[in-house]
Amino acid sequence: MLDSKLLRTQLQDVADRLASRGFTLDVARIESLEAQRKVVQTRTEQLQAERNARSKSIGQAKQRGEDIAPLMADVERMGNELSEGKVELDGIQAELDALVLSIPNLPHESVPVGADEEGNVEVRRWGTPTSFDFEVKDHVALGEKFGWLDFETAAKLSGARFALLRGPIARLHRALAQFMINLHINEHGYEETYTPYLVQAPALQGTGQLPKFEEDLFKISREGEADLYLIPTAEVSLTNIVSGEILDAKQLPLKFVAHTPCFRSEAGASGRDTRGMIRQHQFDKVEMVQIVAPDDSMAALESLTGNAERVLQLLELPYRTLALCTGDMGFSAVKTYDLEVWIPSQDKYREISSCSNCGDFQARRMQARWRNPETGKPELVHTLNGSGLAVGRTLVAVLENYQQADGSIRVPEVLKPYMGGLEVIG
């Protein structure tokens, strides 16, 4: 969340910057609540001082043998008024807190200004879109030909937007995840992490999914116990490792990587990508998270994005890198790069990774800090996250880019050790 001091001292500037994201900040409401808060706080502070003085005078009057009943009555009345004032102040603060939690992050000055995905800027391309001398099949046709990609059975089990993988395609899916994890551990210096797939609400509030995006989550209600949510991304569990912590400067940067299933209701995606594995309720992802000192976060974003790009390069999959514009960035991000991989059957690039610097936005919500050696004081860390990569979409890209005329699939060179030396599927 944003610094409350910033909202008090530079409210209109914040509103102007948020407008570039297409977000309208309710300036009048915040100003009204802040004014109410100041009035009530001043009144309660004055009342507390007066009550303290009256309480002190009770002892003095008692020593003089005076009737202290009127003073006692005044102190009791003031105590009741203070209790009422605290309730009023808590109510105002709760509304302010709820407003602040609904406000997205401020975009970095280097982020291109735009209303939607049309305003995104291509930064670079790698590889040439794959060309074929035969009619291209999509991943659904390729997978269903041998019965290894089964949406009908998945629908029988779980409904729409699920997939059942079997045989060599299931193995290829596993190979991709293992390859990604090993690459990030061995070449990029990440620590492999196994996290819970169920988290409590404070973890999701910490990374920004709650309260604003609850409809996108799968919730498990438990009588007499805290609700649990299936993680929409391992970003939630990995980033919250440092929730409430004060880290030593020598611990930074922290670099975590995890392979997990992810669960999303896709509430806003009705009618979009209904065929195949592009948009699922359950999908696997290898997620990278970095916790860094504030001065290092922009350089860390470039490094993180490069780590994700390396996966695509080694798989020899054509892709492009986009700098997202202000209107297309995620809620918690200060700057984001998206990687889009070439999907031959769609004749276009599709998102396969999103790499974001969230600045101190998540850290403030989580109270994740480090001790700055220059000041000796705890300060907020910066957090970053990125897909390295979405395993299902990478599988789609491999199936389609490595297809052959007979419907068989060549196994990418870097995956052969994970496939027992198998060179062709089908």
From Swiss-Prot:
A biological-process GO annotation: seryl-tRNA aminoacylation
Protein's UniProt keywords contain Hydrolase: no
Pathway annotation from the record: Aminoacyl-tRNA biosynthesis; selenocysteinyl-tRNA(Sec) biosynthesis; L-seryl-tRNA(Sec) from L-serine and tRNA(Sec): step 1/1
Catalysed reaction equations from the record: tRNA(Ser) + L-serine + ATP = L-seryl-tRNA(Ser) + AMP + diphosphate + H(+); tRNA(Sec) + L-serine + ATP = L-seryl-tRNA(Sec) + AMP + diphosphate + H(+)
Signal peptide start-end: none
CC annotations in GO: cytoplasm
Main location class: cytoplasm
Cell compartments where the protein resides: Cytoplasm
Binding site residues for L-serine: T233, A234, E235, E287, S387
Binding positions (ATP): R264, S265, E266, E351, I352, S353, S354
Keywords: Aminoacyl-tRNA synthetase, ATP-binding, Cytoplasm, Ligase, Nucleotide-binding, Protein biosynthesis
EC number: 6.1.1.11
GO MF annotation: an example: serine-tRNA ligase activity
Domain of life of the organism encoding this protein: Bacteria
Subunit structure: Homodimer. The tRNA molecule binds across the dimer.
Family (UniProt): Belongs to the class-II aminoacyl-tRNA synthetase family. Type-1 seryl-tRNA synthetase subfamily.
Free-text comment on this protein's domains from its UniProt entry: Consists of two distinct domains, a catalytic core and a N-terminal extension that is involved in tRNA binding.
General function of this protein: Catalyzes the attachment of serine to tRNA(Ser). Is also able to aminoacylate tRNA(Sec) with serine, to form the misacylated tRNA L-seryl-tRNA(Sec), which will be further converted into selenocysteinyl-tRNA(Sec).
NCBIfam families in the cross-refs: serS
Protein name: Serine--tRNA ligase
Native organism: Pseudomonas syringae pv. syringae (strain B728a)
Taxonomic lineage from the root: Bacteria, Pseudomonadati, Pseudomonadota, Gammaproteobacteria, Pseudomonadales
Designated gene of the protein: serS
